[in-house]
Amino acid sequence: MADASIEFKGTSFTLSVLHLKTSKLADIRADLVKKVAQAPDFFYLVPVVVNIEQLDCSIDYQAVKTLIEEFNFTFVGFTGSVDKEQRKLIRELGFSFVNTTRVDTSQKAAIAEKAIVAESKVTAAIPECNLYTDKVHRGQIRSGQQIYAKDQNLVVIGSVSAGAEVIADGNIHVYGSLRGRAIAGAKGHHKAQIYCQNLEAELVSINGNYWLSESMEQHWGSPVYIHLTDSELTSSKLI
């Protein structure tokens, strides 16, 4: 018998989650306008799950979906509700409800052990960022420009202007001010890092984890390096 043309498999993906703190659509719209304006290209067609856990009243689910898609996000579904009737209603309206997985301590230990083994198996397949060659750009990167270092680290000897974008599959070094968007580890390198002499970025991202400017207040205007710790972005001041 010939092999089937399709196969279903379980896997996991990193999705952006939009946490709603109000059911007022006008307020949600106003805040989305501000957020998307900071990095419109980055958010274009990004898959989004809407978390309704913090809402203390009902909301127009169809209106929320329409609003999300108006800003060119790809709407995936809702999450966060512990109310069975609410989840039932969401599904009856034709929307997906995405369950989050809660893992107890013993399970976490077992998963961590498996993760260490799995990581050791794929190390040879994915080169460390320090094995990459460097792509060097000399001079300022101006608004509207995009520089991509495919399978390389990116070294910018100059500043990255607001509205500009630098992308690398490895690390990003900016010997100047970083005012635009910096996306490191673009192909999935969780050990990628971002270095700059003056942090004033619109957005920074490593392996799909990102911060917008308001998340960088601690080291704003300072020389920093940004990296992932336990899948969370962390910034440290350079001495």
Swiss-Prot record:
Signal peptide stretch: none
A GO biological-process term: cell morphogenesis
Pfam families to which the protein is assigned, alphabetical: MinC_C, MinC_N
The keyword Cell cycle is annotated on this UniProt entry: yes
Functional description taken from the UniProt entry: Cell division inhibitor that blocks the formation of polar Z ring septums. Rapidly oscillates between the poles of the cell to destabilize FtsZ filaments that have formed before they mature into polar Z rings. Prevents FtsZ polymerization.
Subunit annotation: Interacts with MinD and FtsZ.
Family: Belongs to the MinC family.
Name of protein: Probable septum site-determining protein MinC
Organism: Colwellia psychrerythraea (strain 34H / ATCC BAA-681) (Vibrio psychroerythus)
Gene designation per UniProt: minC
